[in-house]
């Protein structure tokens, strides 16, 4: 099956954000509606959740959310007849490949990438020294400078060539060291974490057993506080003469390779660490940072455009300002004239209404007089008729 496409990851990001994650993680309750809408059996959904929740914290970050969405879609569409027993390598986030390798080593009781025999483990000493000498620090910084990205971050896979040159450090121990300095399982680590990570590998290469925890001052370093490389208060302050004389030079071959071309990229991969899907799709520490940087660039371009448009409009407005003022004055004068005409019309209408009432009264009086004259005429006509009748009778 193909890797996750960038467009697919962006689609999952929109869904992820719409569910309003808390601390960049989603709970089972927040995902319940999506899981139910898939109409997959509960047994399959549980198996998919177990595969997706790589760090076993009961919540899914964005990378784990991408995994569960892709697995659900592939099962629904028939691309996967059944839920796989383990994640395919192309679906494993690069930031969590070390966790999966460590979990395999614990669950299976062995490590496919190189086990530690009991006899070899017995040879390891417990006098692990957290102190980073100036010489070692200089070596670690050279390695860091050769592999850090533009944000000053280091990926686990970017040091594959260094891992290949370690003869006494199995892959499981490299993963353990990475998890020790990267407790939040980020895809990348900063400079302070890188220096401590390389120091742990250096100590392990020289026969020191990797401890299970880190001093409090280093935990503060991993929390982005000011680092303190002199940890004599928490660990043994000095290194014995026998240790110094018998100490193996760390990453000597690797330093010789990068000495002539610090910026060269490594193409060597011994197969111990398959490169998983890069969910960031761009350089950066996380999607939120990349998104904000893009938005900032868009806003800067928009601001430049607005400033240029405003400048052009200002130049044009200086030429047209006088004409605009005259036009506005003319429009207001016409409005005033219109309002005055309306007022005059209203006054005249009121006067005309008074004159009309007087005329109506005159008409009514004339009508009454006409009626009276008509009655008088009728009476006289009747009298004339009687006189005419009398004259006729006398004849």
UniProtKB/Swiss-Prot annotation:
The keyword Transferase does not apply. Residues 305-314 have a biased composition (Basic and acidic residues). It comes from Candida albicans (strain SC5314 / ATCC MYA-2876) (Yeast). This is Actin cytoskeleton-regulatory complex protein END3. Ca(2+) binds at residues 53, 55, 57, 59, 64. Belongs to the END3 family. The keyword Lipid metabolism does not apply. Residues 8-98, 136-225 form the EH domain. SUPFAM superfamilies: EF-hand (SSF47473).
């Amino acid at each position: 099956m193909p890797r996750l496409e960038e467009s697919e990851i962006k689609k999952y990001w929109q869904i992820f954000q719409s569910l309003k994650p808390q601390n960049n993680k989603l709970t089972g309750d927040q995902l319940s509606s999506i899981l139910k809408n898939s109409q997959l059996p509960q047994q399959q959904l549980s198996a998919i959740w177990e595969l997706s929740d790589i760090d076993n914290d009961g919540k899914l970050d964005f990378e784990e959310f991408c995994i569960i969405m892709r697995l659900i879609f592939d099962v629904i569409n028939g691309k996967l007849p059944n839920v796989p027993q383990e994640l395919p390598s192309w679906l494993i986030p690069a930031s969590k490949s070390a966790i999966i390798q460590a979990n395999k080593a614990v669950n299976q009781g062995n490590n496919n990438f190189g086990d530690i025999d009991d006899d070899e483990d017995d040879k390891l000493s417990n006098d692990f020294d957290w102190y980073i000498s100036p010489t070692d620090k200089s070596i670690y910084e050279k390695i860091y400078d050769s592999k850090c990205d533009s944000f000053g971050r280091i990926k686990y896979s970017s040091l594959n060539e260094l891992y290949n040159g370690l003869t006494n450090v199995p892959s499981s121990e490299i993963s353990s060291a990475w998890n020790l300095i990267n407790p939040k399982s980020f895809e990348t680590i900063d400079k302070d974490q890188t220096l401590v990570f390389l120091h742990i590998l250096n100590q392990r290469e020289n026969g020191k057993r990797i401890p299970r925890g880190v001093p409090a001052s280093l935990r503060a370093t991993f929390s982005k506080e000011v680092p303190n490389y002199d940890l004599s208060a928490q660990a043994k302050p000095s290194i014995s003469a026998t240790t110094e004389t018998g100490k193996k030079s760390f990453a000597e071959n690797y330093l010789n390779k990068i000495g002539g071309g610090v910026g060269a990229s490594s193409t060597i991969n011994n197969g111990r660490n398959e490169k998983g899907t890069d969910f960031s799709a761009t350089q950066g520490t996380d999607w939120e940072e990349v998104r904000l940087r893009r938005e900032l660039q868009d806003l800067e371009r928009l601001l430049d455009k607005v400033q240029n448009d405003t400048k052009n409009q200002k130049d044009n407005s200086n030429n047209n300002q006088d004409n605009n003022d005259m036009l506005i004055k003319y429009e207001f004068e016409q409005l005033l004239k219109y309002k005055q005409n309306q007022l005059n019309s209203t006054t005249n209408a009121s006067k005309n209404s008074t004159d009309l009432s007087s005329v109506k009264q005159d008409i009514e009086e004339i009508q009454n007089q006409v009626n009276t004259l008509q009655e008088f005429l009728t009476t006289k006509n009747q009298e004339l008729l009687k006189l005419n009748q009398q004259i006729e009778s006398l004849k």
